[in-house]
């Protein structure tokens, strides 16, 4: 989202009925998100759906003086989380913890985790 579309000096954190949305300043833009949507299509090409974008706009617009529109969006990106298997079918209910295993002599594998804890994950992998 272009920086001039949101009048603010700092980022925001918004709580929704399903998640938390972030509005983060980044250079000349704002990064607005995130969603946690099941993805059952091509795993090599995840994409933000119209429903994801509508959800974000609907919720962020509740706190903005000037609502954002689809035409304001300059780019979107999506990714998949490497979640560990668990008890639930819903990804939003699965643990964000990571696991480290020595697969073979000299080979360590790591699964799960979050981008925000990559340093802890790396340290755990090195200690193996």
Language model: regions and residue ranges:
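C-terminal catalytic lobe of FAD-dependent flavoproteins
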Residues: 1-128
């Amino acid at each position: 989202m272009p920086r001039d579309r949101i009048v603010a000096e700092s980022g925001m954190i918004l709580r929704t009925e399903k998640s938390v949305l972030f509005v983060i300043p980044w250079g000349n833009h704002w990064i607005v998100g995130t969603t946690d949507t099941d993805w059952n299509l091509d795993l090599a090409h995840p994409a933000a759906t119209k429903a994801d974008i509508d959800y974000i706009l609907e919720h962020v617009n509740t706190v903005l003086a000037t609502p954002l529109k689809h035409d304001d969006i300059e780019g979107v990106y999506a990714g998949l989380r490497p979640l560990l298997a668990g008890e639930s079918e819903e990804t939003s209910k699965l643990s964000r913890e990571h696991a480290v295993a020595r697969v073979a002599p000299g080979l360590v594998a790591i699964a799960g985790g979050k981008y925000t804890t990559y340093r802890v994950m790396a340290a755990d992998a090195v200690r193996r």
